[in-house]
Every structure is written in structure tokens, then in C-alpha cells.
């Protein structure tokens, strides 16, 4: 067992639920695959699950039981879950009864979905991965939780995440992605082993899981799909690392109400799944038919007709599409003013994979514009170079050292986290960011401070009123570099439908522009870290994908492009769980 505080409770619960559903507590791989005859939940998409449910081949109870059995078999390897919903089977029974009575709520009716554990659920604890919140039962559901349940989804589990969405600890001891004080490290199903390198042998995974959302359970078919959140790449990164399709939508597409915040200026939720079709279905369920009065940003984009993103699943969408290839930084290393150290670029294996991706685009009839230049990535004026304006993220970026980074994340954390705590009322275990920091220090021996709390510290230094002007100035500069001199310049200047970037490298600019980005799996590359693994360690290859980024509210077009690319490539490989 590699789990941290409280984690083993989830496994025990899974075993009990699996046993009460008619399965033994430890099933063989073959038994955990079978629901009815040769039907399997492994790698099975939402449309296929719905077809099976509609035909009566399976019931929602059988689906939940099969997923619980799979969790019971493999969770100890992955540590992907913080809490399993103890009422999942009861919910499945109710939805089966509705279906039998002729009521089908939508394409997620009776489908098990997991939520990142910073998304509030009143009936399942919401920990954010922090010890202080390990028993938190919020007094209200997140808007997206309500929408999913109204659509018939079964919330089967709450997933591991990087603690507080990766806003607990940066330098000098950065928190490892998908580590929480509540549950420990999560592992990547493509190689669920610990990193054996000296200096890294502390329990962390040998293949990074990405973060702060978790893709491990979704990749391993623990559920049909999951919902993550993203402030600066937290959907794109784990999707890339776990061979998933992930969408970080335009800010405002999906309500953030009831999601533990970092900053409302960049936070969003989004779907993560094994196929583009599944993310399209989940995207429609997550977006409200009307703006959420609890989130003013939800007026930005207009939902498609009937919130149906599957209408854009067009296998021929690449024909005639204009796709830009931004070589500088994303493909080829660049130097920035005042620093001779190269930044960005790809290794040989990644370069070959991206060459294959570009060739596929051309073969599908896309008009590939190669290269295109993003002005803020090559600007020689330091004040206009995006790479020189990172967000303040570690102890070195305290008030005395934050002149050359954007304070937006740390300012937003002070403003929005305290407001979120206030919304919890009597359920809140602490009432302010200051109290949380004090609580962590008082419980350091229990594991609350394994990586420190430098990001909480620099956030708590901010004064919401006194630092408002600085935050607004930094936001304006960020918008200029990521939009006007960034994505807008390249997309509009070349009349592009999208740009294509490797792996998760395009996540940062898309997130800071609040523009949509979608990842698509595209194969495996050697896992060759620096420093290297010890002699004799047989590292397995790691996932690597591509990402399409477009203008604000361009999700329908990006989904179409991603679907066409996925259909033409078919490069997703299931993790070797069996």
C-alpha cells in the first residue's frame, strides 16, 4: 500500500461495494472486464455504453459494479482516487428505474463519471487534497455537479489531484504533480512504478502523471470519463501524460461556482476522456443552457443548439482547415533577451512524432501553414516577451521579489480562496488563508507540510485592496502578450482555424489567454529524463499527444478538428493494466 492519510478507506469501501454487488472483493482481470457475456467496460466509450443500456444488454447497476470491481483490482497500483461514492449503486438503481419507466435524461443517463476532488459534492467529501479539508462536506454542490446529476450521470468517485490544484508549494521544494497530503502520490498507468533515481526516490511516479487534475483512473477505465479543472494547464498536462482527450474550454463556458479556486481570472473546469466523442458529450452536460447567476463569466460564449457538441464530430473536418505550426519555442528552442539558455524545443523522438502529425494533417487535406510566428515568443524587447513574464509561483516571488512576474495567481488565491471559505459557512474548517497556513504548520507532523507551503505564503502576503492596481496591470500585460501579441496575432494574422502544438506545451499561453485548447493522444515516446535512470532500469515509453488551440468560444471547431485527427490517426494505446 502506497496510500497516505485516509486513502485506504476508499479501497475498503470499493471492496465492500463490489462484494455487495454480487462480485467477490478481488476479481481476476477477466472477471472485472465482463459485464454481460463479452461486453466490457475497458476502453468502452459513452456512446457504446448508452447503446448497451438502451438495448437492455446491461443496466447502470451492472456498469457501476463492473467499474467498482476494476477499481478494486487496480487502485492499489495507481492511487487515483480519494473517495468512492458510497451511494453509487443506489443512484444506479434509481436511474435504471427511470429508464424502465421511459425516462432517459440525456446521453449521460446512468453513466459513471468521476470528479476532481476540488469540485464540490454535498454527499461526498470534498478535500482539495489538503489535510485541513479531509472531512469537508460542503453545504452546496458545484453548479457542474448539479448539471451532471440532472443529466443522469452517476458521480462514482472523487479523484486525486495535486493539492489545492497545485497551489500549495512551489520553490524551493515544489510539490510533485498529483501528490496530496490526503492520499499521497498517484501513479501513471503506463508505468505505475516509483522513480528509482537518487534524489527522486521519495515515492513519486516514474512517469509523471501531469497535474493538477488526474488522468490515471480515466486512462485505466475506472469510469467512463472525468471532470478536471485548469488554471494554467491542469487539464491539458494530465491528459497528455495519460493518453487522454482533454478540453480546457474558454473561460466562462463552464461555471466555476463550487470549484475550490485559485483565481477566477483563469480557473475553469473541463472534460477528460479517452475519445473526442466522449469529451464532446461530457462538454455538453457541463455547460449550462443559460448563464449561471453565481458565475458572471458564463455569459461569454453561447452554447450550441441543445448543448450538443456531438453535432461537430466531423471526420472530414481537416479538409480545407488552415492549421498553423508555431515552430519557435514549441518545436525549436529559442533564446530570450538577457538569457543565452535555450528554452523549449523537442527531442528527436518528439520531433519525429510531430512530423508524423503534420504529415497526417496534410494527407487529410488541411492547409498547413508552416512556420507561423507568435510575436510574443520571439520578441527581443524584454517587456514584450511572453517567456519572461511567468506567474509568481515560489518563495523567491514573495513581495520583495515579484517585480518581473505576474501576481495574478497569488493575488487571485488571496481574493478568491478567502471568499470561497466564507461561502462554506459553519462547514469551513478554517476561515481564511492565514488560518490554513497556521493549521498546516500545527499539523506538519501529520504530513501537511511535506513540500512546504510557499505558494500559500506568497499568496497570503497580498492585500486585496492595496494590490488591486498591480493585479490589473499584470492582467493587462498578460492579455497583451498571450492574446494581442500572442494567439490573436497568429490566428487572425494567418486566418487560421487553429495552431498545432506538441504535448502540453501550448497549455500555458492558452490558459493565460483564457482560450480553448484540446489535446489528442498520438503515441508513445521514450521516457528519458535528466538525470537518467540507473543502469538496468527498463523504463516504459510515455504518452505524448498533440493539441489544437483556437480563438475564444471556438470549441465546436476545435472538437471537429480533433475528431477528424483522432479518426485518421487512431494512435491511442490502452495502458498495459492486464
Model-derived segments and spans:
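Short glycine/serine-rich loop/turn segments
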Residues: 108-269, 294-300, 326-328, 332-333, ...
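Short helix-loop capping/hinge segments that flank enzyme active sites or metal/cofactor-binding pockets
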Residues: 109-131, 312, 317-339, 389-483, ...
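Structural helix-boundary/capping segments
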Residues: 73, 220-334, 339, 343, ...
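An N-terminal boundary/leader segment
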Residues: 2-3, 7-100, 330, 351-366, ...
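Glycine-rich, small-residue loops and helix-cap segments
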Residues: 56, 110, 150, 199, ...
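Acyltransferase
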Residues: 62-64, 93, 147-150, 308-314, ...
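Short, well-ordered beta-strand elements within core beta-sheets of diverse protein domains
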Residues: 48-55, 133-136, 267-274, 548-550
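Loop/turn elements at helix/coil->beta-strand transitions in domains of secreted/extracellular proteins
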Residues: 59-61, 77-78, 104, 109-111, ...
Amino acid at each position: 500500500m502506497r496510500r497516505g492519510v485516509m486513502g485506504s478507506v476508499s479501497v475498503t469501501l470499493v471492496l465492500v461495494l463490489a462484494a455487495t454487488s454480487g462480485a467477490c472483493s478481488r476479481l481476476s482481470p477477466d472477471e472485472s472486464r465482463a459485464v454481460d457475456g463479452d461486453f466490457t467496460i475497458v476502453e468502452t466509450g459513452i456512446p457504446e455504453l448508452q447503446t448497451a443500456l438502451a438495448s437492455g444488454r446491461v443496466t447502470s447497476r451492472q456498469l457501476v459494479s463492473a467499474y467498482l470491481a476494476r477499481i478494486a483490482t487496480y487502485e492499489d497500483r495507481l492511487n487515483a482516487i480519494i473517495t468512492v461514492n458510497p451511494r453509487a449503486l443506489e443512484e444506479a438503481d434509481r436511474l435504471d428505474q427511470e429508464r424502465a419507466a421511459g425516462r432517459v435524461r440525456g446521453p449521460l443517463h446512468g453513466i459513471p463519471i468521476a470528479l476532481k476532488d476540488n469540485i464540490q459534492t454535498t454527499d461526498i467529501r470534498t478535500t482539495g487534497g489538503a489535510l485541513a479539508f479531509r472531512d469537508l462536506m460542503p453545504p452546496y454542490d458545484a453548479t457542474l455537479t448539479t448539471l451532471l446529476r440532472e443529466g443522469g450521470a452517476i458521480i462514482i468517485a472523487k479523484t486525486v489531484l495535486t493539492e489545492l490544484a497545485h497551489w500549495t508549494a512551489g520553490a524551493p521544494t515544489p510539490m510533485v504533480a498529483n501528490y496530496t497530503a490526503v492520499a499521497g502520490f498517484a501513479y501513471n498507468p503506463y508505468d505505475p512504478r516509483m522513480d528509482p533515481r537518487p534524489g527522486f526516490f521519495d515515492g513519486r511516479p516514474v512517469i509523471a502523471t501531469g497535474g493538477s487534475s488526474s488522468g490515471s483512473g480515466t486512462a485505466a477505465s475506472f469510469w467512463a470519463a472525468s471532470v478536471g479543472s485548469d488554471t494554467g494547464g491542469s487539464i491539458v498536462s494530465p491528459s497528455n501524460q495519460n493518453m487522454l482527450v482533454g478540453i480546457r474550454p474558454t473561460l466562462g463556458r463552464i461555471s466555476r461556482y463550487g470549484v475550490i479556486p485559485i483565481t477566477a481570472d483563469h480557473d475553469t473546469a473541463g472534460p477528460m476522456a479517452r475519445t473526442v466523442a466522449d469529451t464532446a458529450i461530457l462538454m455538453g452536460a457541463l455547460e449550462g443552457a443559460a448563464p449561471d447567476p453565481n458565475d458572471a463569466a458564463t455569459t461569454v460564449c453561447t452554447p450550441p443548439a441543445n448543448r450538443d457538441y456531438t453535432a461537430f464530430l466531423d471526420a472530414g473536418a481537416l479538409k480545407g482547415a488552415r492549421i498553423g505550426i508555431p515552430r519557435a519555442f514549441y518545436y525549436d528552442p529559442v533564446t530570450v533577451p538577457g538569457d543565452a539558455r535555450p528554452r523549449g524545443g523537442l527531442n528527436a523522438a518528439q520531433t519525429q512524432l510531430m512530423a508524423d502529425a503534420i504529415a497526417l494533417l496534410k494527407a487529410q487535406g488541411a492547409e498547413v501553414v508552416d512556420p507561423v510566428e507568435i510575436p510574443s515568443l520571439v520578441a527581443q524587447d524584454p517587456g514584450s516577451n511572453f517567456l519572461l513574464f511567468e506567474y509568481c509561483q515560489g518563495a523567491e516571488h514573495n513581495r520583495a521579489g515579484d517585480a518581473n512576474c505576474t501576481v495574478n495567481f497569488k493575488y487571485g488565491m488571496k481574493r478568491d480562496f478567502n471568499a470561497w471559505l466564507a461561502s462554506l459557512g459553519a462547514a469551513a474548517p478554517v476561515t481564511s488563508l492565514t488560518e490554513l497556513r497556521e493549521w498546516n504548520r500545527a499539523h506538519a507532523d501529520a504530513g501537511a507540510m511535506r513540500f512546504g507551503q510557499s505558494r500559500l505564503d506568497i499568496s497570503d502576503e497580498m492585500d486585496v485592496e492595496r494590490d488591486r492596481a498591480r493585479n490589473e496591470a499584470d492582467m493587462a500585460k498578460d492579455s497583451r502578450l498571450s492574446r494581442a501579441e500572442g494567439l490573436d496575432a497568429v490566428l487572425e494574422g494567418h486566418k487560421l482555424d487553429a495552431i498545432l502544438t506538441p504535448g502540453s506545451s501550448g497549455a500555458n499561453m492558452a490558459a493565460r489567454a483564457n482560450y480553448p485548447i484540446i489535446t489528442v493522444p498520438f503515441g508513445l515516446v521514450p521516457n528519458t529524463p535528466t538525470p537518467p535512470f540507473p543502469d538496468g532500469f527498463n523504463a516504459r515509453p510515455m504518452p505524448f499527444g498533440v493539441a489544437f488551440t483556437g480563438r475564444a468560444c471556438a470549441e465546436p471547431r476545435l472538437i471537429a478538428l480533433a475528431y477528424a485527427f483522432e479518426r485518421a490517426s487512431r494512435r491511442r494505446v490502452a495502458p498495459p493494466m492486464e
